[in-house]
């Protein structure tokens, strides 16, 4: 293990083997020490460690490993406040004396996840910097550390909306997990399956969502981890809605609701009611949709700093679809109260598009659909919205007797729908 430490700290300090070995031992002898192939003398080890500024003494690795894994489990179980407290009171003080490379890499990887999922101030770029620090040691990582690295980097790309990159990393992590030599637990495998289902959901790959969501549920249910099972049920609800299986969608969402209402989980309640409203809206049951949306908003507003603009937007949209323009305008104004106009994202396009529809401003609506909205969602491979907005534009062109343009966008909508498989 001391050889591993010497190699790790030599690389972090930017030293070549020749530079470290100079005046202490031969380069070939140092190479053998780093690989663990040589029976090294204490004197040589002490001199090498002294030059690197590290101690040759081992710490209680099992104790540190257990502590780091306990911290990680708090994050996986979404006990974010406890995870933060544990980091400051336990992890950081003890890590000051740790020099074992694998423990440091584990700590830095887990820290990257902590930055990413922080419940108050997530630091996405801080997380990415942590991951980049560990990247140069990927080839030397143990299989379980490689698994974590791939998982966490995929989470980063999912948040950045680069779903193809995220999926490639998750499939690589799945290959590692399937070798059964990683030391990764079954419950961590379930989290991997959930992230695969989540990423396929972003890409509207309905069949793959079901495949991985059910895999994850089978493990979560065995371990009585009903919170994570509920997350998977929500994904199944979303997928079934996309393909028009509304009864199945409602079934899965209400399965998740059993958990969230029992444990008074307002965050999950907000997500579920939001999606139940969307199911009702797709069926054109406006009063039912609005009832669910208001329940979602009530639940979301019980949590400080929670995201509400997507539900507010859907309330405005539902009033518009119900031909209640007065309330549509009232709720559209509320959308603009929480919308950051400098951030061009999904919500920006959904809300601006709705604004032009409510105002009957077809000139600006055609402009933003053709040049902004549709290309934006195509780039993200978000085919559901590509289909929705392409059909909307096709209908406008049809009403204007621009049949060639109308046909082009109907074809574009159909092509997008074929990607929802």
How would you label these PLM feature ranges?
Residues 1-12:
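A short, Lys/Arg-rich alpha-helix, primarily the initiator
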Residues 7, 348-421:
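C-terminal non-catalytic interaction modules
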Residues 14-31:
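Short alpha-helical DNA-recognition segment
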Residues 41-58:
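DNA major-groove recognition helix of helix-turn-helix/homeodomain DNA-binding modules
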Residues 99-105, 140-148, 182-191, 223-231, ...:
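Alpha-solenoid helical repeat architecture
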């Amino acid at each position: 293990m001391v050889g591993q430490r010497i190699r790790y700290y030599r690389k972090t300090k930017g030293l070549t083997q020749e530079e470290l070995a100079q005046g202490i031992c031969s380069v070939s002898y140092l190479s053998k020490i780093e690989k663990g192939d040589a029976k090294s003398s204490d004197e040589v080890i002490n001199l090498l460690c002294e030059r690197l500024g590290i101690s040759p003494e081992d710490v209680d690795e099992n104790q540190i490993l257990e502590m780091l894994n306990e911290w990680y489990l708090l994050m996986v179980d979404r006990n974010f406040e406890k995870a933060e407290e544990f980091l400051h009171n336990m992890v950081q003080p003890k890590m000051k004396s740790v020099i074992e490379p694998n423990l440091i890499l584990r700590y830095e990887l887990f820290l990257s996840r902590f930055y990413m999922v922080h419940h108050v101030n997530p630091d996405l770029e801080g997380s990415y910097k942590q991951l980049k620090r560990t990247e140069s040691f990927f080839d030397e990582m143990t299989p379980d550390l490689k698994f974590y690295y791939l998982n966490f980097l995929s989470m980063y790309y999912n948040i950045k909306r680069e779903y193809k990159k995220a999926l490639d990393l998750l499939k690589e992590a799945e290959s590692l997990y399937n070798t059964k030599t990683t030391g990764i637990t079954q419950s961590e495998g379930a989290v991997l399956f959930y992230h695969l289902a989540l990423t396929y959901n972003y890409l509207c790959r309905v069949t793959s969502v079901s495949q991985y969501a059910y895999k994850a549920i089978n493990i979560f249910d065995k371990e009585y981890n009903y919170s994570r099972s509920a997350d998977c049920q929500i994904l199944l609800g979303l997928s079934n809605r996309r393909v028009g299986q509304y009864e199945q969608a409602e079934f899965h969402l209400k399965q998740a609701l059993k958990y969230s209402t029992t444990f008074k989980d307002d965050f999950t309640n907000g997500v579920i009611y939001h999606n139940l409203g969307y199911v009702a809206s797709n069926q054109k049951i406006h009063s039912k949709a609005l009832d669910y949306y208001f329940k979602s908003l009530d639940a979301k507003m019980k949590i400080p700093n929670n995201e509400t603009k997507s539900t507010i937007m859907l309330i405005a949209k539902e009033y518009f679809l119900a031909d209640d323009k007065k309330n549509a305008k009232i709720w559209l104004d509320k959308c603009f109260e929480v919308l950051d106009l400098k951030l061009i994202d999904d919500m920006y396009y959904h809300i601006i598009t709705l604004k032009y529809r409510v105002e009957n401003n077809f000139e600006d609506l055609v402009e933003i659909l053709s040049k902004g909205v549709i290309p934006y969602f195509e780039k993200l491979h978000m085919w559901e919205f590509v289909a929705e907005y392409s059909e909307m534009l096709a209908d406008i062109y049809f009403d204007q007797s621009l049949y060639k343009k109308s046909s082009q966008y109907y074809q574009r909508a159909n092509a997008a729908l074929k990607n929802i498989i």
